[in-house]
Amino acid sequence: MATGKIIQVIGAVVDVEFPQDAVPKVYNALEVEGTTEKLVLEVQQQLGGGVVRCIAMGSSDGLSRGLKVTNLEHPIEVPVGKATLGRIMNVLGEPIDMKGPIGEEERWAIHREAPSYEELASSQDLLETGIKVMDLICPFAKGGKVGLFGGAGVGKTVNMMELIRNIAIEHSGYSVFAGVGERTREGNDFYHEMTDSNVLDKVSLVYGQMNEPPGNRLRVALTGLTMAEKFRDEGRDVLLFIDNIYRYTLAGTEVSALLGRMPSAVGYQPTLAEEMGVLQERITSTKTGSITSVQAVYVPADDLTDPSPATTFAHLDATVVLSRQIASLGIYPAVDPLDSTSRQLDPLVVGQEHYDVARGVQSILQRYQELKDIIAILGMDELSEDDKLVVSRARKIQRFLSQPFFVAEVFTGSPGKFVSLKDTIRGFKGIMNGDYDHLPEQAFYMVGTIEEAVEKAKKL
């Protein structure tokens, strides 16, 4: 193993000089010697003259010029397989849950090729989430990719936790959760939530939180993905949750600037599309097994045309858009039924009835949206009888799209509800057909099935 020495440290970027005949390859891992904490660097550029520019996977505090660095001669490798279940690991696959070594049988490099075209497979099976608005408007496909888009504080992480809880309990497969640049508190809450719902032994957790250097946050998504790929290649259907994909992009922006690349639109890295592609192309299903992924996507300043969310859109099968306006009405989950889409919402996949009900719900809500201006200026009395009926049904639908969550029981004080797709379609079909025109709209707020709304109306 060749050794070199540090010649320059600029924040998270470290330049290391090696002998001319032993320059490490790009993406090779290097280990710094003589530091109290283990520090791994990843080669990003070869500058010539035996010098390589690297990003640090940990804090570069206390590094000095002249420290010895060893070339490990392979990319960063992490534990994979069943030994990782129920454990919390960092970007290097080291345990951070104080439960001793992982005891893995195999380690895989985090940089891997995406599967070839011949190996790819797609599926039309639906994954039932038990969340009414998602199952109805933007159904998820098994082996598909779902994005949860939303600005700050509209409920991406809570929706993600509810999805994990529902799917992990209903679907008995394995899941991998990658916490990319999110709050440590959320990671902690998440761990306890998994423990309480008794699904921790089916989940591998990989965390690279907000306080970590950019190199760490840039690679932690790949660490989680590598663990998911191992389960997929063993022939399993695995779930991959990434919270938050925007922080992956942001870490790339930080690293790109430190490496001296010219910024592109809005200050993002010039390699934005390629970096996103490298990650997303690997999140796919093959003939052996499937990876179903749910990714939270932070939308800066609620602007969906920002280059980061816009680049992510292209890779997804279903997009769940969370709206600040709906959250301000107190309707949770704050999913915008007119902005959310899914490739599965096709009569050939979901069936004619589901398709008609979903499109019917959207058209009623769209009509209500158009009438809002008239109501604001002239008042409800100026509407025709038909339009009054549309408004009344739209307001009921809007409230019926809300639902109490299991993971939010502490905040709402009402028990969570899992609603089957069959019940969801039946409920919305009834509202559209006017079967519940006699009930007050408050009865539809924060209930599960339509029967609960009828019961609630009796108490009002």
From Swiss-Prot:
Localization, UniProt: Cell inner membrane
Keyword Transport tagged: yes
Superkingdom of the source species: Bacteria
Positions with a binding annotation for ATP: 150-157
PROSITE patterns linked: ATPASE_ALPHA_BETA
Protein name: ATP synthase subunit beta
UniProt family annotation: Belongs to the ATPase alpha/beta chains family.
Subunit structure: F-type ATPases have 2 components, CF(1) - the catalytic core - and CF(0) - the membrane proton channel. CF(1) has five subunits: alpha(3), beta(3), gamma(1), delta(1), epsilon(1). CF(0) has three main subunits: a(1), b(2) and c(9-12). The alpha and beta chains form an alternating ring which encloses part of the gamma chain. CF(1) is attached to CF(0) by a central stalk formed by the gamma and epsilon chains, while a peripheral stalk is formed by the delta and b chains.
Function: Produces ATP from ADP in the presence of a proton gradient across the membrane. The catalytic sites are hosted primarily by the beta subunits.
Organism: Yersinia pestis
Database matches in HAMAP family: ATP_synth_beta_bact (MF_01347)
GO cellular component term of the entry, any: plasma membrane
Topology versus the membrane: Peripheral membrane protein
Catalytic activities: ATP + H2O + 4 H(+)(in) = ADP + phosphate + 5 H(+)(out)
GO molecular function, one term: proton-transporting ATP synthase activity, rotational mechanism
UniProt keyword annotation of Transferase present: no
CDD domains xref list: ATP-synt_F1_beta_C (cd18110), ATP-synt_F1_beta_N (cd18115), F1-ATPase_beta_CD (cd01133)
Keywords carried by this UniProt record: ATP synthesis, ATP-binding, Cell inner membrane, Cell membrane, CF(1), Hydrogen ion transport, Ion transport, Membrane, Nucleotide-binding, Translocase, Transport
Classification via SUPFAM superfamilies: C-terminal domain of alpha and beta subunits of F1 ATP synthase, N-terminal domain of alpha and beta subunits of F1 ATP synthase, P-loop containing nucleoside triphosphate hydrolases
EC number of the protein: 7.1.2.2
